[in-house]
Amino acid sequence: MRRDHLQPRLLTIASIVVGTVGWSGYALLLPVALAFPILWSRARTRRVAALVSAGYFLAASRGLPQGVAAFYTSDLWPGLLLWLCASGSFVVVHTVLWTKRSDCRPFRYLLAAVLMAVPPMGITGWAHPVTAAGILFPGWGWWGLVATTAGLMGLVTRMWPAVAIAFTGFWLWSAANWTESKLPASWQGVDLKLGSTLGRNTSIQRHRDLIATVKDRASGGVRNVVLPESALGFWTPTFERLWVKALQGTEISVISGAAAIDATGYDNVLVTLSADGGRVLYRERMPVPGSMWQPWGSWLGESDGARAHFFANPVVTVGNSRVAPLICYEQLVVWPTLQSMLYEPDLIVAVGNGWWTKGTSIVAIQRVNAIAWAKLFAKPLVLSFNT
Protein backbone atom coordinates (compact mmCIF):
# COMPACT_ATOMS: atom_id res chain seq x y z
CA MET A 1 0.00 0.00 0.00
CA ARG A 2 2.82 2.35 0.87
CA ARG A 3 4.48 1.49 -2.43
CA ASP A 4 1.31 2.40 -4.33
CA HIS A 5 1.25 5.71 -2.52
CA LEU A 6 4.89 6.52 -3.31
CA GLN A 7 4.95 5.42 -6.94
CA PRO A 8 3.27 8.53 -8.44
CA ARG A 9 5.66 10.81 -6.58
CA LEU A 10 8.72 8.81 -7.57
CA LEU A 11 7.67 8.66 -11.22
CA THR A 12 6.99 12.40 -11.30
CA ILE A 13 10.32 13.23 -9.67
CA ALA A 14 12.10 10.88 -12.07
CA SER A 15 10.40 12.52 -15.07
CA ILE A 16 11.56 15.95 -13.88
CA VAL A 17 15.13 14.66 -13.58
CA VAL A 18 14.95 13.11 -17.05
CA GLY A 19 13.64 16.33 -18.59
CA THR A 20 16.26 18.42 -16.81
CA VAL A 21 19.27 16.25 -17.65
CA GLY A 22 18.23 15.16 -21.14
CA TRP A 23 17.58 18.74 -22.21
CA SER A 24 20.51 20.43 -20.48
CA GLY A 25 22.18 21.53 -23.72
CA TYR A 26 24.80 18.77 -23.95
CA ALA A 27 24.55 16.56 -27.03
CA LEU A 28 25.74 13.36 -25.39
CA LEU A 29 23.07 13.67 -22.66
CA LEU A 30 20.17 13.73 -25.13
CA PRO A 31 19.60 9.94 -24.85
CA VAL A 32 18.56 10.45 -21.22
CA ALA A 33 15.26 11.71 -22.67
CA LEU A 34 14.57 8.15 -23.85
CA ALA A 35 13.72 7.28 -20.24
CA PHE A 36 10.49 9.28 -20.53
CA PRO A 37 8.46 6.54 -22.30
CA ILE A 38 9.55 4.06 -19.63
CA LEU A 39 8.23 6.31 -16.87
CA TRP A 40 5.05 7.04 -18.84
CA SER A 41 4.36 3.33 -19.29
CA ARG A 42 4.94 2.61 -15.59
CA ALA A 43 2.10 4.93 -14.58
CA ARG A 44 -0.85 2.96 -13.20
CA THR A 45 -3.49 5.59 -13.78
CA ARG A 46 -4.19 8.29 -16.35
CA ARG A 47 -3.69 10.95 -13.67
CA VAL A 48 -0.18 9.72 -12.94
CA ALA A 49 0.58 9.60 -16.68
CA ALA A 50 -0.45 13.26 -16.84
CA LEU A 51 1.84 14.14 -13.92
CA VAL A 52 4.76 12.28 -15.51
CA SER A 53 4.19 14.02 -18.86
CA ALA A 54 3.90 17.44 -17.24
CA GLY A 55 6.99 16.90 -15.10
CA TYR A 56 9.10 15.89 -18.10
CA PHE A 57 7.94 18.66 -20.43
CA LEU A 58 8.03 21.47 -17.89
CA ALA A 59 11.53 20.47 -16.81
CA ALA A 60 12.75 20.24 -20.40
CA SER A 61 11.36 23.70 -21.24
CA ARG A 62 12.31 25.29 -17.92
CA GLY A 63 14.13 28.22 -19.56
CA LEU A 64 10.96 29.58 -21.16
CA PRO A 65 9.59 31.73 -18.28
CA GLN A 66 12.89 33.53 -17.73
CA GLY A 67 13.42 33.97 -21.48
CA VAL A 68 9.96 35.45 -22.02
CA ALA A 69 10.46 37.82 -19.08
CA ALA A 70 13.73 39.03 -20.63
CA PHE A 71 12.20 39.39 -24.11
CA TYR A 72 9.26 41.48 -22.95
CA THR A 73 11.16 43.14 -20.06
CA SER A 74 8.37 42.01 -17.75
CA ASP A 75 8.04 39.89 -14.63
CA LEU A 76 7.88 36.10 -14.69
CA TRP A 77 4.09 35.75 -14.80
CA PRO A 78 3.61 36.06 -18.60
CA GLY A 79 6.41 33.54 -19.09
CA LEU A 80 4.94 31.16 -16.54
CA LEU A 81 1.55 31.36 -18.25
CA LEU A 82 3.06 30.66 -21.68
CA TRP A 83 5.13 27.84 -20.18
CA LEU A 84 2.03 26.13 -18.80
CA CYS A 85 0.01 26.70 -21.98
CA ALA A 86 2.80 25.32 -24.18
CA SER A 87 2.90 22.13 -22.13
CA GLY A 88 -0.81 21.60 -22.74
CA SER A 89 -0.58 19.76 -26.06
CA PHE A 90 2.18 17.43 -24.84
CA VAL A 91 0.35 16.58 -21.62
CA VAL A 92 -3.05 16.17 -23.28
CA VAL A 93 -1.72 13.88 -26.02
CA HIS A 94 0.19 11.63 -23.63
CA THR A 95 -2.65 11.58 -21.11
CA VAL A 96 -5.39 10.75 -23.59
CA LEU A 97 -3.34 8.03 -25.31
CA TRP A 98 -2.13 6.38 -22.10
CA THR A 99 -3.64 2.93 -21.56
CA LYS A 100 -3.47 0.11 -19.06
CA ARG A 101 -3.52 -2.48 -21.85
CA SER A 102 0.06 -3.57 -22.45
CA ASP A 103 -0.74 -4.92 -25.93
CA CYS A 104 -2.00 -1.52 -27.11
CA ARG A 105 0.55 0.63 -25.33
CA PRO A 106 3.34 0.57 -27.98
CA PHE A 107 0.95 1.70 -30.70
CA ARG A 108 -0.55 4.35 -28.45
CA TYR A 109 2.91 5.71 -27.73
CA LEU A 110 3.80 5.63 -31.42
CA LEU A 111 0.69 7.68 -32.17
CA ALA A 112 1.63 10.16 -29.43
CA ALA A 113 5.15 10.48 -30.83
CA VAL A 114 3.84 11.11 -34.35
CA LEU A 115 1.28 13.66 -33.17
CA MET A 116 3.97 15.59 -31.30
CA ALA A 117 6.24 15.58 -34.36
CA VAL A 118 3.88 17.18 -36.91
CA PRO A 119 1.43 20.11 -36.87
CA PRO A 120 -0.83 21.02 -35.26
CA MET A 121 0.31 19.37 -32.01
CA GLY A 122 3.89 19.39 -33.21
CA ILE A 123 3.90 23.20 -33.24
CA THR A 124 4.82 22.93 -29.56
CA GLY A 125 6.52 19.55 -29.93
CA TRP A 126 9.67 20.47 -28.04
CA ALA A 127 11.79 17.95 -26.17
CA HIS A 128 10.87 15.07 -28.47
CA PRO A 129 12.79 11.94 -27.39
CA VAL A 130 13.26 10.87 -31.03
CA THR A 131 15.83 13.69 -31.38
CA ALA A 132 18.27 11.38 -29.57
CA ALA A 133 18.43 9.27 -32.75
CA GLY A 134 21.31 11.43 -33.96
CA ILE A 135 23.36 10.62 -30.88
CA LEU A 136 22.63 6.89 -30.85
CA PHE A 137 22.83 6.23 -34.57
CA PRO A 138 25.05 8.87 -36.23
CA GLY A 139 25.12 8.48 -39.98
CA TRP A 140 22.24 5.99 -40.09
CA GLY A 141 19.83 8.47 -41.64
CA TRP A 142 16.23 7.33 -41.95
CA TRP A 143 17.16 3.86 -40.68
CA GLY A 144 18.41 5.45 -37.48
CA LEU A 145 15.10 7.26 -37.12
CA VAL A 146 13.23 3.98 -37.66
CA ALA A 147 15.45 2.17 -35.14
CA THR A 148 14.91 4.86 -32.51
CA THR A 149 11.15 4.90 -33.09
CA ALA A 150 10.98 1.11 -32.81
CA GLY A 151 13.05 1.33 -29.64
CA LEU A 152 10.71 3.93 -28.17
CA MET A 153 7.84 1.53 -28.75
CA GLY A 154 9.82 -1.24 -27.10
CA LEU A 155 10.50 0.91 -24.05
CA VAL A 156 6.80 0.91 -23.14
CA THR A 157 6.58 -2.91 -23.15
CA ARG A 158 7.74 -5.59 -20.73
CA MET A 159 10.85 -5.89 -22.91
CA TRP A 160 12.00 -2.42 -21.89
CA PRO A 161 15.10 -3.58 -19.94
CA ALA A 162 16.50 -5.31 -23.04
CA VAL A 163 15.74 -2.28 -25.22
CA ALA A 164 17.29 0.05 -22.65
CA ILE A 165 20.46 -2.06 -22.54
CA ALA A 166 20.68 -2.01 -26.35
CA PHE A 167 20.22 1.76 -26.43
CA THR A 168 22.86 2.17 -23.73
CA GLY A 169 25.31 0.14 -25.79
CA PHE A 170 24.81 2.36 -28.84
CA TRP A 171 25.04 5.43 -26.59
CA LEU A 172 28.40 4.37 -25.13
CA TRP A 173 29.72 3.46 -28.57
CA SER A 174 28.69 6.85 -29.92
CA ALA A 175 30.24 8.70 -26.96
CA ALA A 176 33.51 6.83 -27.38
CA ASN A 177 33.69 7.77 -31.07
CA TRP A 178 32.22 11.26 -30.83
CA THR A 179 33.60 13.99 -33.06
CA GLU A 180 32.44 17.56 -33.56
CA SER A 181 30.16 18.26 -36.51
CA LYS A 182 32.22 19.06 -39.58
CA LEU A 183 32.04 22.48 -41.18
CA PRO A 184 31.52 22.33 -44.95
CA ALA A 185 34.32 23.61 -47.15
CA SER A 186 33.93 27.27 -48.19
CA TRP A 187 31.29 27.93 -45.49
CA GLN A 188 31.67 29.91 -42.25
CA GLY A 189 29.09 30.65 -39.56
CA VAL A 190 29.53 33.82 -37.51
CA ASP A 191 28.50 33.97 -33.85
CA LEU A 192 27.82 37.48 -32.54
CA LYS A 193 27.43 38.89 -29.04
CA LEU A 194 25.44 42.03 -29.76
CA GLY A 195 22.54 41.32 -27.43
CA SER A 196 19.17 42.91 -28.10
CA THR A 197 20.68 45.52 -30.44
CA LEU A 198 21.04 43.03 -33.32
CA GLY A 199 18.28 43.72 -35.81
CA ARG A 200 17.09 46.73 -33.82
CA ASN A 201 20.06 48.98 -34.40
CA THR A 202 19.61 49.55 -38.13
CA SER A 203 22.13 52.36 -38.52
CA ILE A 204 24.45 52.50 -41.51
CA GLN A 205 27.38 52.12 -39.11
CA ARG A 206 26.00 48.82 -37.78
CA HIS A 207 25.73 47.49 -41.33
CA ARG A 208 29.27 48.63 -42.08
CA ASP A 209 30.48 46.82 -38.97
CA LEU A 210 28.73 43.64 -40.12
CA ILE A 211 30.23 44.00 -43.60
CA ALA A 212 33.69 44.32 -42.03
CA THR A 213 33.04 41.18 -39.96
CA VAL A 214 31.98 39.26 -43.06
CA LYS A 215 35.07 40.28 -45.02
CA ASP A 216 37.28 39.36 -42.09
CA ARG A 217 35.78 35.86 -41.92
CA ALA A 218 35.89 35.33 -45.70
CA SER A 219 39.47 34.11 -45.88
CA GLY A 220 41.25 30.85 -46.52
CA GLY A 221 38.85 29.68 -49.19
CA VAL A 222 35.66 30.74 -47.37
CA ARG A 223 33.09 32.06 -49.83
CA ASN A 224 29.77 31.67 -48.00
CA VAL A 225 29.41 33.54 -44.71
CA VAL A 226 26.33 33.03 -42.51
CA LEU A 227 25.06 35.70 -40.09
CA PRO A 228 22.48 35.12 -37.31
CA GLU A 229 18.72 35.50 -37.39
CA SER A 230 17.56 39.15 -37.74
CA ALA A 231 21.13 40.39 -38.28
CA LEU A 232 20.10 42.81 -41.05
CA GLY A 233 16.93 44.03 -39.36
CA PHE A 234 14.29 45.12 -41.88
CA TRP A 235 15.06 44.01 -45.44
CA THR A 236 14.96 47.19 -47.57
CA PRO A 237 16.29 48.20 -51.02
CA THR A 238 18.56 50.74 -49.33
CA PHE A 239 20.39 48.16 -47.25
CA GLU A 240 20.48 45.76 -50.19
CA ARG A 241 22.29 48.37 -52.30
CA LEU A 242 24.70 49.11 -49.43
CA TRP A 243 25.71 45.46 -49.12
CA VAL A 244 25.88 44.78 -52.85
CA LYS A 245 28.16 47.78 -53.34
CA ALA A 246 30.39 46.69 -50.44
CA LEU A 247 30.72 43.18 -51.91
CA GLN A 248 31.79 44.36 -55.35
CA GLY A 249 35.07 42.82 -56.44
CA THR A 250 34.67 39.82 -54.10
CA GLU A 251 33.32 36.30 -54.49
CA ILE A 252 31.65 36.43 -51.07
CA SER A 253 28.06 35.27 -50.65
CA VAL A 254 26.36 36.34 -47.41
CA ILE A 255 23.39 34.47 -45.93
CA SER A 256 21.75 36.47 -43.16
CA GLY A 257 18.58 36.75 -41.16
CA ALA A 258 16.22 39.67 -41.76
CA ALA A 259 12.55 40.66 -41.63
CA ALA A 260 10.61 41.19 -44.87
CA ILE A 261 7.60 43.42 -44.19
CA ASP A 262 4.47 44.16 -46.22
CA ALA A 263 0.93 45.38 -45.58
CA THR A 264 -0.31 42.04 -44.25
CA GLY A 265 2.48 41.29 -41.78
CA TYR A 266 6.04 40.12 -42.08
CA ASP A 267 8.18 37.09 -42.83
CA ASN A 268 11.17 36.04 -40.78
CA VAL A 269 13.60 35.32 -43.59
CA LEU A 270 17.09 34.46 -44.70
CA VAL A 271 18.43 36.64 -47.49
CA THR A 272 21.43 36.07 -49.71
CA LEU A 273 23.70 38.90 -50.81
CA SER A 274 26.61 39.03 -53.22
CA ALA A 275 28.16 41.39 -55.74
CA ASP A 276 25.43 40.29 -58.18
CA GLY A 277 22.56 41.44 -55.95
CA GLY A 278 20.34 40.30 -53.10
CA ARG A 279 17.15 38.31 -52.69
CA VAL A 280 15.02 36.56 -50.12
CA LEU A 281 16.34 33.02 -49.89
CA TYR A 282 14.04 31.41 -47.31
CA ARG A 283 10.85 32.25 -45.44
CA GLU A 284 10.56 30.70 -41.99
CA ARG A 285 8.18 27.78 -41.80
CA MET A 286 7.51 28.01 -38.06
CA PRO A 287 8.06 31.31 -36.23
CA VAL A 288 7.81 31.37 -32.43
CA PRO A 289 4.12 30.87 -31.51
CA GLY A 290 2.67 33.75 -29.54
CA SER A 291 5.48 36.28 -29.71
CA MET A 292 5.93 36.12 -33.51
CA TRP A 293 3.29 33.90 -35.09
CA GLN A 294 -0.15 35.07 -33.93
CA PRO A 295 -2.83 33.21 -35.92
CA TRP A 296 -5.61 34.91 -33.99
CA GLY A 297 -4.58 38.22 -35.57
CA SER A 298 -6.52 37.47 -38.76
CA TRP A 299 -9.66 36.82 -36.69
CA LEU A 300 -9.26 40.18 -34.94
CA GLY A 301 -8.41 42.10 -38.09
CA GLU A 302 -4.78 42.60 -37.04
CA SER A 303 -1.83 41.95 -39.34
CA ASP A 304 1.37 42.65 -37.44
CA GLY A 305 2.52 39.09 -36.76
CA ALA A 306 4.96 36.83 -38.56
CA ARG A 307 3.54 34.46 -41.14
CA ALA A 308 4.09 30.71 -40.86
CA HIS A 309 4.95 28.99 -44.15
CA PHE A 310 4.53 25.52 -42.59
CA PHE A 311 5.68 23.22 -45.41
CA ALA A 312 7.12 25.74 -47.88
CA ASN A 313 10.75 26.01 -49.10
CA PRO A 314 12.25 23.05 -47.18
CA VAL A 315 15.43 23.31 -49.25
CA VAL A 316 17.01 26.35 -50.92
CA THR A 317 19.91 26.70 -53.34
CA VAL A 318 23.07 28.69 -52.61
CA GLY A 319 25.55 28.48 -55.47
CA ASN A 320 25.92 24.79 -56.22
CA SER A 321 24.71 23.66 -52.78
CA ARG A 322 21.27 22.55 -51.66
CA VAL A 323 20.74 23.91 -48.16
CA ALA A 324 18.30 22.90 -45.40
CA PRO A 325 17.64 26.17 -43.51
CA LEU A 326 16.48 26.26 -39.89
CA ILE A 327 15.71 29.53 -38.14
CA CYS A 328 15.55 29.64 -34.34
CA TYR A 329 12.30 27.94 -33.23
CA GLU A 330 12.45 25.45 -36.09
CA GLN A 331 15.42 23.85 -34.36
CA LEU A 332 13.27 22.96 -31.33
CA VAL A 333 10.55 21.04 -33.18
CA VAL A 334 10.79 17.96 -35.35
CA TRP A 335 9.02 18.31 -38.66
CA PRO A 336 11.00 21.17 -40.32
CA THR A 337 14.24 19.17 -40.23
CA LEU A 338 12.67 15.89 -41.32
CA GLN A 339 10.81 17.60 -44.15
CA SER A 340 14.07 19.15 -45.36
CA MET A 341 15.88 15.80 -45.18
CA LEU A 342 13.35 14.30 -47.61
CA TYR A 343 14.94 16.51 -50.28
CA GLU A 344 18.49 15.30 -49.58
CA PRO A 345 20.22 18.65 -48.97
CA ASP A 346 23.98 19.00 -49.06
CA LEU A 347 24.18 20.77 -45.70
CA ILE A 348 22.17 22.29 -42.84
CA VAL A 349 22.31 26.00 -41.97
CA ALA A 350 20.91 26.81 -38.50
CA VAL A 351 20.68 30.40 -37.26
CA GLY A 352 19.22 32.05 -34.18
CA ASN A 353 19.02 35.26 -32.20
CA GLY A 354 19.02 34.18 -28.57
CA TRP A 355 19.96 37.32 -26.66
CA TRP A 356 16.77 36.98 -24.62
CA THR A 357 17.73 33.48 -23.43
CA LYS A 358 20.66 34.64 -21.28
CA GLY A 359 20.90 32.53 -18.15
CA THR A 360 18.95 29.65 -19.71
CA SER A 361 19.88 26.59 -21.77
CA ILE A 362 17.61 27.46 -24.73
CA VAL A 363 20.35 28.37 -27.23
CA ALA A 364 22.42 25.38 -26.14
CA ILE A 365 19.40 23.12 -26.74
CA GLN A 366 18.85 24.66 -30.18
CA ARG A 367 22.46 23.96 -31.07
CA VAL A 368 22.29 20.42 -29.72
CA ASN A 369 19.13 19.65 -31.69
CA ALA A 370 20.74 20.89 -34.90
CA ILE A 371 23.88 18.87 -34.14
CA ALA A 372 21.83 15.72 -33.46
CA TRP A 373 19.92 15.93 -36.75
CA ALA A 374 23.10 16.73 -38.69
CA LYS A 375 24.79 13.71 -37.09
CA LEU A 376 21.88 11.40 -37.86
CA PHE A 377 21.81 12.29 -41.55
CA ALA A 378 25.59 12.84 -41.86
CA LYS A 379 25.16 16.41 -43.09
CA PRO A 380 27.68 19.22 -42.67
CA LEU A 381 26.35 21.87 -40.29
CA VAL A 382 26.78 25.66 -40.24
CA LEU A 383 25.70 27.42 -37.04
CA SER A 384 25.30 31.15 -36.47
CA PHE A 385 23.83 32.63 -33.29
CA ASN A 386 23.63 35.99 -31.58
CA THR A 387 23.63 36.12 -27.79
Swiss-Prot record:
What InterPro entries does the annotation carry?
C-N_Hydrolase, C-N_Hydrolase_sf, Conjugal_tfr_TraB_rhizob
Give the protein's recorded name.
Probable conjugal transfer protein TraB
Q: Which family does it belong to?
A: To A.tumefaciens Ti plasmid TraB.
Q: Which domain of life is it from?
A: Bacteria
Protein location: Cell membrane
Tell me which residues make up the CN hydrolase domain: 187-387
Described purpose of this protein according to its UniProt entry = Enhances conjugal transfer of the plasmid.
| Membrane topology field | Multi-pass membrane protein
List the transmembrane segments: 16-36, 51-71, 76-96, 110-130, 135-155, 159-179, 252-272, 332-352
Question: Which Gene Ontology terms of cellular component type are present?
Answer: plasma membrane
Q: List the disulfide bonds.
A: none
Q: What is its main location?
A: membrane
Q: Which UniProt keywords apply?
A: Cell membrane, Conjugation, Membrane, Plasmid, Transmembrane, Transmembrane helix
State one Pfam family annotation. CN_hydrolase
Record bears the keyword Transmembrane helix: yes
